[in-house]
Amino acid sequence: MPYDNVIAITYQGSSLPVVHHRCARGPNVFRHLETTYLTGAYVLDPIYQYHLRRERSGIFRLLDVAPDQFKRSHYYEWYYGLIGITDEISVVQTVGDDTTITVSMGKDRSSAQMFSWLDERRLRRHEAVIMTLLKAHWASGADPLSRQPRGLTITDGLIAAMRDRHSLTLSRRQAEVALLILQGHSSVSIGLNLSISPQTVKVYRKQLYHKCNLSSQAELFALTMPILQQISMLPTGKQRSSVTRAG
């Protein structure tokens, strides 16, 4: 299957992702990987959230696992607009209790194309072989990751940082709603994740925006992104994620 770029990442629990391989045939779409994605933006990534939910292995288009309003989210506009990836197909293989191996193939501005249904079908023909190879590679111990206990959740970290950095006291629900908004969930989707009504979600969002003196998702993103970067830099075992039940 022709692609413009490819990256292999392993996620383990809520530890920082480990990048094993990257290659871009055209523009360097990975130029912001260390400075942006790995310093906190990954927390909002659909593939990372899919990993945390421990859902089935398979081959997925990005929007197959993304929230319902992902392409309208400020994260999508900010990060995907920044790197220039226009389409993505990921091979996702779960191994063990908390580890996910991913290989993501992308299209970017160099080809100005999207993956066709025929591209996807050809890749799926080899799905069983690809998954077997990924599991065998992991079992061989080629890319071991340290296993450490999990501690503070991303939600708790957001609450604590808002208090310490901005003297703002968020309830757990307000913090959960904030994170889900940033991931690209609609009010209906947030309600399904938190088992509350869309109307209640709107109440929490209104409270959140009022408390933080915000008027847009872009302002919420600007306020919370430095905090997510701070949380992501905590030693492993000091942070783990929550709000990860549905896509």
Describe every region a protein language model picked out.
Residues 2-109, 122, 128, 132-138:
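Regulatory input/activation interfaces that engage signals or partners
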Residues 111-155:
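Juxtadomain coupling helices with adjacent low-complexity linkers
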Residues 143-173, 233-236, 241:
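Regulatory hinge/linker segments at domain boundaries
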Residues 170, 189, 203, 218, ...:
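Non-catalytic regulatory/interaction regions at protein termini and inter-domain linkers
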Residues 175-177, 219:
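Pre-recognition alpha-helix immediately N-terminal to the DNA-recognition helix
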Residues 181-185, 224:
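Short helix-to-turn junction characteristic of helix-turn-helix DNA-binding domains
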Residues 184-219:
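Recognition helix of helix-turn-helix DNA-binding domains
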Residues 210-215, 223, 227-231:
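Residue cluster at the C-terminal edge of the helix-turn-helix DNA-binding motif
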